[in-house]
C-alpha cells in the first residue's frame, strides 16, 4: 500500500516552518481567566416554604421511598461489639468517681507525716530529713548538760551508735543522719560549747569515713565553729588518730588546737562534770577492760626483776652525785 505525502512535508525545508520555542515568558500577555461558579441560594429556614431544605420539593415521591421495615436487618445483642478505646466517658466518670477521689488528709496522718519527715534549714537551704530511716541511730548525738558559767553546752557524740557500712542504703542513711546531727547541734548550742567524741567500743565498719567527717566540719555554721571551745576524743584509736593527722592540713590551726585525747572515763571526769552525760553500756565495759589491762601491764613492769635492778642503779647514781 502506497502512502502519499503532501509535497514538502518530509523535505528539509519543512523544519524551517516549525515555530521557534519562546525565549521568555510573556508576563503581559492574556491568560485564560478562571470561571467563578455561583452557589445556588439555599433557604435554611425550618419552615416548608419554597426553596427550604424541609420543603416537599426535595423529597422523593411516595413510590420511591416505599420501604418495608419488616425486611430490614437489624443487629441484635450478639452482633454488637465494643471498640476498644471508645468507651463512654460519662460512664467511666460515674464508675470511677469513687476511685479517683482524693482521700481526706486527716490530722493523725499529718502528725504521722511530720514524725516521718523533718524540714530543716542548713546553710540557707531547706532540707528534708527522713526520720524513719535514722530512728535507730538518733542516740548518736545527745546533750550532756553544761560546764562552767552560763549556757556552755556539752554535746556527746557516741560513734558506737553509727550504722554499719554493710547496709545497702548506707550512704542514704548517713546523708540523713548528717543533716540530723547538724540541725540538732544548732538547736542545742546557745553559747560556747564542747564536743565529747566517744570513740570506744566502735568497730571499724561503723567508723565514719573521712569524707563524711570533712563534710560535717564544712557544713557547720561559722558561729558554731567559732563557739566550739574543745573537742575531746575519748578512747582514741589508731584509725582516728590517722584521720586527724591526714586532715590537719585541711583544717584551721585553731581547730587543731582544740582537739584533746582522753584515754579513760576517769580522766574525762577530771575535765568536765559527768552528771548529765549518758555513757553507753558498751563504752563502760570497754573502759573497764582497758583499765584492767593497763593495771595488769603496770603491775608486771613493777614486778619485773630487771626493772627493779635498773631502778636501784638509778638511785645509786643519784646518791653518788654531790
Curated annotation (Swiss-Prot):
A GO CC annotation given for this chain: presynapse
Major localisation: cytoplasm
Gene3D superfamilies: CRAL-TRIO lipid binding domain
Alphabetical UniProt keywords: Apoptosis, Cytoplasm
Keyword Cytoplasm: yes
Biased composition annotated in UniProt, kind: Polar residues: 40-52
InterPro entries to which the protein is assigned, alphabetical: Bcl2-/adenovirus-E1B, CRAL-TRIO_dom, CRAL-TRIO_dom_sf
Known role: May play an important role in regulating differentiation, survival and aggressiveness of the tumor cells.
Protein name: Protein prune homolog 2
Organism: Rattus norvegicus
Classification lineage: Eukaryota, Metazoa, Chordata, Craniata, Vertebrata
Amino acid at each position: 500500500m502506497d502512502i502519499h505525502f503532501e509535497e514538502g512535508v518530509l523535505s528539509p525545508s519543512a523544519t524551517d516552518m516549525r515555530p521557534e520555542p519562546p525565549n521568555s515568558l510573556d508576563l503581559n500577555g492574556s491568560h485564560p481567566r478562571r470561571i467563578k461558579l455561583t452557589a445556588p441560594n439555599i433557604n435554611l429556614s425550618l419552615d416548608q416554604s419554597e426553596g427550604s431544605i424541609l420543603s416537599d420539593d426535595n423529597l422523593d415521591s411516595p413510590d420511591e421511598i416505599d420501604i418495608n421495615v419488616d425486611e430490614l436487618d437489624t443487629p441484635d445483642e450478639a452482633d454488637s461489639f465494643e471498640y476498644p478505646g471508645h468507651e463512654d466517658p460519662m460512664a467511666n466518670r460515674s464508675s470511677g468517681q469513687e476511685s479517683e477521689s482524693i482521700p481526706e488528709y486527716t490530722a493523725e496522718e499529718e502528725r504521722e507525716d511530720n514524725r516521718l519527715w523533718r524540714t530543716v534549714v542548713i546553710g540557707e537551704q531547706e532540707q528534708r530529713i527522713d526520720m524513719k530511716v535514722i530512728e535507730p541511730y538518733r542516740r548518736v548525738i545527745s546533750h550532756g548538760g553544761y560546764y562552767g558559767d552560763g549556757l556552755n553546752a556539752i554535746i556527746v557524740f557516741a560513734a558506737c551508735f553509727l550504722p554499719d557500712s554493710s547496709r545497702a542504703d548506707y550512704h542514704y542513711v548517713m546523708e540523713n543522719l548528717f543533716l540530723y546531727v547538724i540541725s540538732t547541734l544548732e538547736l542545742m548550742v546557745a553559747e560556747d560549747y564542747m564536743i565529747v567524741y566517744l570513740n570506744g567500743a566502735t568497730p571499724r565498719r561503723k567508723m565514719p569515713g573521712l569524707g563524711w567527717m570533712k563534710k560535717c566540719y564544712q557544713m557547720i555554721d561559722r558561729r558554731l565553729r567559732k563557739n566550739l571551745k574543745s573537742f575531746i576524743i575519748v578512747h582514741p584509736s589508731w584509725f582516728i588518730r590517722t584521720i586527724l593527722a591526714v586532715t590537719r592540713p585541711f583544717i584551721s590551726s585553731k581547730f587543731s588546737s582544740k582537739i584533746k585525747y582522753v584515754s579513760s572515763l576517769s580522766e574525762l571526769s577530771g575535765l568536765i562534770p559527768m552528771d548529765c552525760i549518758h555513757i553507753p553500756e558498751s563504752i563502760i565495759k570497754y573502759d573497764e577492760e582497758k583499765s584492767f589491762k593497763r593495771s595488769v601491764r603496770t603491775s608486771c613492769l613493777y614486778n619485773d626483776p630487771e626493772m627493779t635492778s635498773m631502778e636501784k642503779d638509778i638511785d645509786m647514781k643519784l646518791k653518788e652525785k654531790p
